[in-house]
Structures are given as C-alpha cells and as structure tokens.
C-alpha cells in the first residue's frame, strides 16, 4: 500500500530521530539535486525528520552545477560576442568583441555558486527537521545506510541520485584526456579546438557557445543530421546557421578508435 508518514509539527518530538527505534529518520534522501530538494521541502511541510545525503556533485545537482545553468550562461556569453561582431543592418558596423575567456568562465562559476546558495541551500537553511550530510551512501540493509563510516536508519528512503554521463566504449578513449560537461565547464584556459561526439541538444549547445567564444569546433554525428530527435526542417535551419558560423559538421561519422 501507500507509505504512511507520521504527522507532527516541525521540530516536534513525534518525528525526532532520537525517538525512533535505533534513532531512525522518517525519510532518508540519497541525492542532492532538484528532486531531492523538492522531497525535502515536502517532508518539512509534513513535519518529517529527514536526512539528505549527497555525494559527487555539489548540492543542487546536475542542472545548477554542470547542466542547464552553466550551459545557458555560456550560450548567452557567446551570443553577446556574436552580436558584437555581426549585424543584419547595413548601416551598423560592429567593431567586434574582446573576449576574455577566463573571465567568462569565472563569471559562470560565480553565477553557479550564487544560484546554488539562493535557490537550494538558503531555501532549506531554516528547516528544523532536515539534516544535510555530504558523502556517499551505501545500503547495509533495507533500513540502514552507511555514510563516512557511520550508520543511519530510516523508515523510508528516496533514491534521487540523478544521471551520469554515458561514456561510449571507444577503443583508446580511456587513455586520452577527454572532457565531459562536468570537466569542460571548469576549463578556464580556452582550448584551441574542440571535437564533440554527438549532435544532440547538449552537443549543439556546447558547439554554438564555444565557437562564438573563439574555439574552433567540429561535431561528429553518426546519424544523418544534428538534433535527430527533431523534425528535419529544424535540423536543416540549425545546420545552415552552424556552418555559416564556421562549425564543421560531420554527419554519418562514428568514432571507433583513438
């Protein structure tokens, strides 16, 4: 049946781990991203004692740390650089942009830190029933997890660990210093060139942003077009713009060996 949680006011003794058999929490959340924080907010509304365990990425998860926030920020930075050197009006002569790549990345990092603080940590900072813990959780049994050598018991568990980058099994890939979105967005030194494997929405976002910031970009895609999940007219329009901006597109290419 549906799980039943005890009701009680925030901070009330009815939900205190100390009053549970073995000091159990009402809810243990494994993960620290948007789903985990949404669950923590709901649990606080219900007056549940909650433990949030987060390992890997900082609190806030993929979106704020290595996903939507940094990618859209860099897209906007690239857009500003592009419009500083391109005009659709004959009477307007753009003078170009002086791009400080390192400063762009540092500004991105500041934005990430600010949003992590204001949109996640500050939201739960005054929660009376929530305990946040950094570390990796391992299940010892159906009611117990171990974090950093200590055991914690829970009546219910929510696994909200998100996703990780799928690394393709390409021969020799593990022997080179390849990048994923996790590591690419941290680079403060501008690379001379960038080869992107895959022309989905993540690959095309990165390609457009970094190309406009002065990086020579090539995309390899094993299907016939970019954004294969969209209709062909969208792909054609985007491909035309990308080629006009100097991005090299290689459809029907599959990396097999490094």
Region roles according to the model:
Residues 1-27, 45-48:
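Extreme N-terminal leader/targeting segments of oxidoreductases
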Residues 23-25, 41-48, 54-190, 223-227, ...:
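Glycine-rich flavin
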Residues 24-52, 203-212:
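N-terminal Rossmann-like FAD-binding beta1-loop-alpha1 element of flavoenzymes
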Residues 31-34, 57, 197-200:
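Glycine-rich Rossmann-fold phosphate-binding loop(s) that bind the pyrophosphate
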Residues 188-230:
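Rossmann-like NAD(P)H-binding beta-loop-alpha module
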Residues 249:
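A short beta-strand/loop micro-motif in the catalytic core of glycosyltransferases
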């Amino acid at each position: 049946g549906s799980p039943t949680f005890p009701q009680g006011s925030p901070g009330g003794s009815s939900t205190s781990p100390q009053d549970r058999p073995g000091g159990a929490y009402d809810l243990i959340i494994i993960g620290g991203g948007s789903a985990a924080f949404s669950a923590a907010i709901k649990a606080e509304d219900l007056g549940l004692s909650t433990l949030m365990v987060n390992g890997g990425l900082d609190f806030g998860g993929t979106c704020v740390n290595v996903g939507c926030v940094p990618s859209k920020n860099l897209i906007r930075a690239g857009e500003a650089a592009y419009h500083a050197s391109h005009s659709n009006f004959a009477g307007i002569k753009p003078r170009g942009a002086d791009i400080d790549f390192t400063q762009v990345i540092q500004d991105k990092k500041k934005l990430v830190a600010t949003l992590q603080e204001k949109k996640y940590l500050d939201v739960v900072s005054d929660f009376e029933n929530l305990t946040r813990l950094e570390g990796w959780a391992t299940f010892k049994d159906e009611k117990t997890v171990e974090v950093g050598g200590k055991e914690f018991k829970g009546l219910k568990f929510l696994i909200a660990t998100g996703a990780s980058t799928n690394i393709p099994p390409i021969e020799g890939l593990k022997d080179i210093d390849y990048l994923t979105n996790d590591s690419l967005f941290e680079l403060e030194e501008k690379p001379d060139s960038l080869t992107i494997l895959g022309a989905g929405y993540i690959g095309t976002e990165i390609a457009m942003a970094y190309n406009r910031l002065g990086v020579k970009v090539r995309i390899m895609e094993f299907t016939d077009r970019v954004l294969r999940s969209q209709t062909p007219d969208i792909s054609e329009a985007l491909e035309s713009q990308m080629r006009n901006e100097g991005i090299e597109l290689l459809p029907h290419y599959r990396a097999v060996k490094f």
